[in-house]
Amino acid sequence: MDIEVIHEPEDLMVVAKVSGETVGRLHYRESVPGTWTMYSTVVEPAMEGNGIGSRLTATAVAEARRRGKDINPTCWFVSDWLAKEREAS
């Protein structure tokens, strides 16, 4: 399965697509200047278990860091992903 993950800054989200169809989304907002609040990660039920949520999160986190933003993870999935990343490093 070929999963394409795209940052869409104009919509404040990262999307995952398979064959051109959106199968997952991570939403964020710049709640205060310099901080991205990542508040929602959604993957279509039929696509769960394929690592899509992790790819969405990795892309959003990398983009935030590249832009020098702090991350405020109010979404439980993003919070768990970041905790695992810290444990691995």
Segments predicted by a language model, with ranges:
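Active-site rim helix/loop that mediates acceptor-substrate recognition in acyltransferases
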Residues: 1-11
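Conserved acetyl-CoA-binding loop-helix of GNAT-fold acetyltransferases
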Residues: 49-62
